[in-house]
Design a protein with these regions (language model features):
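Acidic, metal/ion-coordinating pockets
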Residues: 1-204
Length: 204
């Protein structure tokens, strides 16, 4: 078995003392039974998730370009793992059926209802066997879900998997969607994917 807890020691103090601790899980947690694999088609041991929960993370972003690296079966194993082993964790970006995909995730912290949305720009050219499996970033979907979040929450966080890897400046694509998000009620945008820190902006 694996033990990844030490890898999160440097952030543990922050994540364990936060009401909302959000982590971008870049690779699918399909587990060792499927065969652990690295680049370019990742599959990680589920002990990664155990370490994340031990470190205090309670919100997992799984809509990434690597979501379909090992197919639908790996996604279903990932979803089952979180539901069965850590049911209190909010899993975003992956869905087991259409009904689940229609739900907006809203968590309540200190009396504040927070909607969290997670999307990916794509899945590395791998076609989705079912449209509902991974939350893809489209204008129509984002606008529809942001409007629903506005109705059901006090604060909305959008977590897009977007941009260009290793670029220190945001792209026009990111700017376009950031404008759309804010115009439709997003209060905070937390992006992932470039693997570097990009600029932070306040929007009035």
């Amino acid at each position: 078995s694996y033990d990844f807890r030490a890898l999160l020691d440097d952030t543990r103090a922050l994540s364990q003392n936060s009401d909302l601790a959000i982590l971008n899980q870049e690779t699918i947690l399909g587990g060792s039974e499927l065969g652990v694999s690295g680049y370019p088609a990742f599959n990680s041991p589920q002990e990664v998730g155990d370490a994340e929960v031990d470190a205090g993370y309670n919100t997992i972003l799984s809509a990434t370009n690597h979501a379909l690296d090992r197919g639908e079966g790996a996604i279903r194993k990932d979803i089952s793992y979180w539901k069965e082993k850590h049911p209190d964790v909010t899993l975003l970006g992956l869905h087991e059926d259409e009904a689940d995909a229609e739900k907006i995730r809203v968590v309540e912290k200190n009396g504040i209802r927070i909607a969290i949305l997670n999307y990916t720009y794509g899945t590395n050219g791998i076609a989705e066997p079912e449209d509902y499996l991974v939350d893809d970033l489209t204008e129509e979907k984002a606008m529809r879900e942001l409007d629903r979040a506005e109705e059901n929450a006090d604060f909305t966080i959008v977590c897009p998997h977007w941009g260009t890897e290793y670029q220190l400046e945001e792209s026009e694509y990111q700017r376009k969607y950031a404008k759309l998000f804010t115009e439709h009620g997003a209060d905070l945008i937390l992006g992932a994917h470039p693997h570097v820190i990009q600029p932070i902006e306040w929007v009035e």
